[in-house]
Amino acid sequence: MLFNIWFGSSLCYLFLLPFSWVYGFFSTLNRISYKYGWRKVYRFSVPIIVIGNLTIGGNGKTPMVLWLIDQLKTRGWRVGVVSRGYGGRSDKYPIIINSTSCSKKCGDEPLLIWRRTGVLVSVSPNRVKAVSALLKKQPLLDIIISDDGLQHYALFRDIEWVVVHSLRRFGNGCWLPAGPMRERITRLNTVQAIIINGLSNDIQSGAILMQLCPRSIINLVTGEIRPIQPLKDVVAIAGIGYPKQFFMTLQDYGIFPIKTIEFSDHHMYSEIMLSSLTSGNEMLLMTEKDAIKCLDFAHENWWYVHIDVNIHQEDTKKLLSKIESTIQYYKNN
């Protein structure tokens, strides 16, 4: 309902504006309280890069984190990640993810990052404590990536990237709850990189384009890998911030599901729920983020799409140059 108000043409947002003004006041107060030293900002012995959003979910932030981890690991840097762990709930934080971790406690995105990359991942609502736990476990990290957390100002950051979806952009431009904005659009003036997810003819000067590119589909039970190709008899599901993006991507690659089903972001699935969605020889196709939560009860007709990020070579050099110079600065001082 709210997403239709935020990204559609409905005037219902007008009724929510008073609440947005309250949110905006406290959001601004929170930021300036750290900016002017009224509240403590915690700095660590390694550089920290935050990859976040100005809006609520579904912008492609986590794929961007995965891309950056791969780029840095390829260059020999030791990388750690901290995350809030949305969708998870635990009695004890921070959590250092390992082979026994489950998404119900640590969240789906941190578990996905760990499984894809193998880097140390620390989860906590308090990112300062998450970083401390990470460095206690591995003091020799070269850099730490914060998956989201742009508004977590208690954590000092050396570099900030903001990911913007090319289609949804900033919706109606209003603060929560009348709109999707966590902060004003002017916040873009203070970040080191604006990453536009998807093709766009109208981008900010200096912004960098990224594209989500499906590489293969992978079976949840057997691990079999197949190339992306036109498929029939497919039921597609997505429990992410912007499910329609996943379905549109499938169509771009010749996959036209007989049925598409949207779930809320971080939705927790059950075997009974998903097994009832297909019949006969139909394939159940989902995002990798969904698959992370289904591995323990998956059926052999369940597959997920492996997606990579594609960024132009010159833009890649530009992004990594700033990061590597920051890492070297910390090592020399």
From Swiss-Prot:
UniProt xrefs under Pfam families: LpxK
Catalysed reactions listed for this entry: a lipid A disaccharide + ATP = a lipid IVA + ADP + H(+)
InterPro entries: LpxK, P-loop_NTPase
GO MF: ATP binding; tetraacyldisaccharide 4'-kinase activity
Residues at which ATP binds: 55-62
Pathway(s) this gene product operates in, as recorded in its UniProt entry: Glycolipid biosynthesis; lipid IV(A) biosynthesis; lipid IV(A) from (3R)-3-hydroxytetradecanoyl-[acyl-carrier-protein] and UDP-N-acetyl-alpha-D-glucosamine: step 6/6
Family statement: Belongs to the LpxK family.
Protein name: Tetraacyldisaccharide 4'-kinase
Organism listed in the record: Blochmanniella floridana
Lineage: Bacteria, Pseudomonadati, Pseudomonadota, Gammaproteobacteria, Enterobacterales
